Every structure is written in structure tokens, then in C-alpha cells.
Amino acid sequence: MPRYLISFDAHAMDHIPDEDMPAVTNASLAVVQEAINAGVWVFGGGLENQKASIVATDGTVTDGPYPEAIGGLCVVDVPSREEALKWAAKIAVACRCAQEVREFMPDPTVGN
């Protein structure tokens, strides 16, 4: 079955007032639990805010941070992109921010 990355940008939740964060957290945890119960959850979580990231490109090391950094993500194991989009919509409502959906391309040399 295909796996899909569902992610949001690092500052996508900056518009949410601090007093609303407990409700957002609870809603997000409810969607995670729903995905676990449905057997589609692979893993997920938030990423630390970028400070001085290092990115290696063509052997060159460059200091970050970069505005397009991922702030949070999850991976779901579902039969289709349409199903992944349904989960992304649930996450978007819970997190109050847009989500990006991308299919993982398996590496046939390692058997995943």
C-alpha cells in the first residue's frame, strides 16, 4: 500500500492564539488516535524550530534557516491519494492550517 507524507510549514500555526493551543492540541491528538485506530498511522510529530540548520548541497555546506522548512508531519499508509487527502483534510481542520500531501516513492533496492 502506498505511504503518504502529510506536512505543514514551520510557521503555519503562528496565527493561532496561545489560548487556543490546548484545543488545537486536543483536536490533533484526536485525529492521530483516529488514524491509529484505522490502522493507517505510520508515524508523525512536530519538528524543532530551525535555528542554524546545516544543509549539504553538492558537497557545499550552507547555513539556514530556510522559510520553507517543515514544521510538522505524519506518514499514513493508505490505498490511494484520495484517502490521503481525506486524512490531510482532517488534520488541517484540527491543526487550523493547510497541509501538503506527497506520496513516498519506495526504494526498490532496500525492499520498502
How would you name each of these model-derived features?
Residues 1-112:
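Conserved, structured core segments of small domains
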